[in-house]
Amino acid sequence: MCGIVGAIAQRDVAEILLEGLRRLEYRGYDSAGLAVVDAEGHMTRLRRLGKVQMLAQAAEEHPLHGGTGIAHTRWATHGEPSEANAHPHVSEHIVVVHNGIIENHEPLREELKARGYTFVSETDTEVIAHLVNWELKQGGTLREAVLRAIPQLRGAYGTVIMDSRHPDTLLAARSGSPLVIGLGMGENFIASDQLALLPVTRRFIFLEEGDIAEITRRSVNIFDKTGAEVKRQDIESNLQYDAGDKGIYRHYMQKEIYEQPNAIKNTLTGRISHGQVDLSELGPNADELLSKVEHIQILACGTSYNSGMVSRYWFESLAGIPCDVEIASEFRYRKSAVRRNSLMITLSQSGETADTLAGLRLSKELGYLGSLAICNVPGSSLVRESDLALMTNAGTEIGVASTKAFTTQLTVLLMLVAKLSRLKGLDASIEHDIVHGLQALPSRIEQMLSQDKRIEALAEDFSDKHHALFLGRGDQYPIALEGALKLKEISYIHAEAYAAGELKHGPLALIDADMPVIVVAPNNELLEKLKSNIEEVRARGGQLYVFADQDAGFVSSDNMHIIEMPHVEEVIAPIFYTVPLQLLAYHVALIKGTDVDQPRNLAKSVTVE
């Protein structure tokens, strides 16, 4: 959600800002803008509703010169998508971009109106611009004005502030929304995501909660909320912006579906040795902590929540450890009882999901045994704030609908299950079967992808549908949830998932000839139960689409389409059966003509509540 890029240099920075915004497009947005100040203090601002390319075209028509600038992509929260609501916002010579939500913007707006300020947008961000302007009028430097203004804000914010009268300085403040400073040679940068700055630097400082930074071309000074100077370590990033172009693929989502065999190989690299899972990257003290674990609490949102749901079956059935999975936005606002020696596991592709981060911070107050983050972005807030972290190493994921981040999360979770089973002294065959399954997984998915054309043909049946039902049992139920989420995310078809045994408790009332029912049916101990559920749907005229193990004994009929899947090891079946559901959602969206990579109203990284 929302992207920030800022730069202060001797050279013109407009193209640096635009390239940074292009690299943040995957997060989702509805408008874009930038402001540049030259050495004489002349400020030029451009804003456009729509894509960054429209802003870039405007910049070509109105060349921007100046060595100090800030830019932003907006995902609407307060106020509709419009040019007037696009950032940067201005209060005389003060220019502001902001990610997050200012919860007390209404009373602040009334106070500022009473002081004579006029608001020209519906946004909460304009409050920051006027508030800093007011505080600056009371005296002191821009930094002092920001230090007085920031404590008046309630909510989450990552904000960068520029004064056109003093173009030698940028101010930034962080609370709940990430900001990272990029260090150059005689120039410095700031962004909401290090990906935006990789063309200009590899050295970064990640701002911590409550930090306020003063940035010039040759210096970066960081202060806490009291104004006391603090030191933050700079790091050399090896992160690769490896999305590149789409190559032979039509969309990033399609590309990322097909990248999954290699992504999983990357996840496994260096982590399997002599037939065992090797997670020594966790550090020398990790085994001591993990051996104490008597309960696991998983927090996540969206697709990551579904991967947590799958892993619950694994932790309990394979490692013998009770496990609960909760939506992070629910966990943080309820009173919960902490189980003895409970490990908090957080799942997030970006590592910046606001509710998941808040849940992690709450867990530290509640007295959990420790915390472990599973994430795709090194150096993200979730990774930095957790006791332990495991990277999925999926590579940059651009499509808003997560694919390879999901399957690599599951791969990491299954490795963790194997390690915990060994630490608990359980039968060595458990780890052996997991390792064997994971090593086979990339080739199994490659086999599955060869059926893409058949799934594409099936997708035609969904083009005029308004609803769909997904069914699964056991550890395939969360895969049904994920399949339904993918379909609704990118095709805008209302889709729901149920545990197949729940059909008679309500969903069966929805079944008719216009309701497609998608079933995942591996050949496991629940197959016969699942067949009974399928017959209940057939008897009521439902249109069935069954992704079934080739040995499961299904036969296609008028209202039952069987898509045979190669037999796979049972332990990896949930990961494997995810892929055909991803392809189905992709092809349905393609037929319907929706924006596959950036579906309406959605953002890649949800950094506000």
Curated annotation (Swiss-Prot):
Natural source organism: Shigella flexneri
Keywords for this protein: Aminotransferase, Cytoplasm, Glutamine amidotransferase, Repeat, Transferase
GO molecular function: carbohydrate derivative binding; glutamine-fructose-6-phosphate transaminase (isomerizing) activity
CDD domains, sorted: GFAT (cd00714), SIS_GlmS_GlmD_1 (cd05008), SIS_GlmS_GlmD_2 (cd05009)
Disulfide bonds: none
A single Gene Ontology CC term: cytosol
Reaction catalyzed: D-fructose 6-phosphate + L-glutamine = D-glucosamine 6-phosphate + L-glutamate
EC number annotated for this UniProt entry: 2.6.1.16
Keyword Transferase: yes
A Pfam family assignment: SIS
Main EC class the enzyme belongs to: transferase
PROSITE patterns the UniProt entry points to: GATASE_TYPE_2, SIS
Active site: 2 (nucleophile), 604 (for fru-6p isomerization activity)
Domain SIS: 286-426, 458-599
Described purpose of this protein according to its UniProt entry: Catalyzes the first step in hexosamine metabolism, converting fructose-6P into glucosamine-6P using glutamine as a nitrogen source.
Keyword Heme applies: no
Subunit and partners: Homodimer.
Cell compartment(s), UniProt: Cytoplasm
Record-given protein name: Glutamine--fructose-6-phosphate aminotransferase [isomerizing]
One Gene Ontology term from the biological process aspect of the record: fructose 6-phosphate metabolic process
Superkingdom of this protein's organism: Bacteria
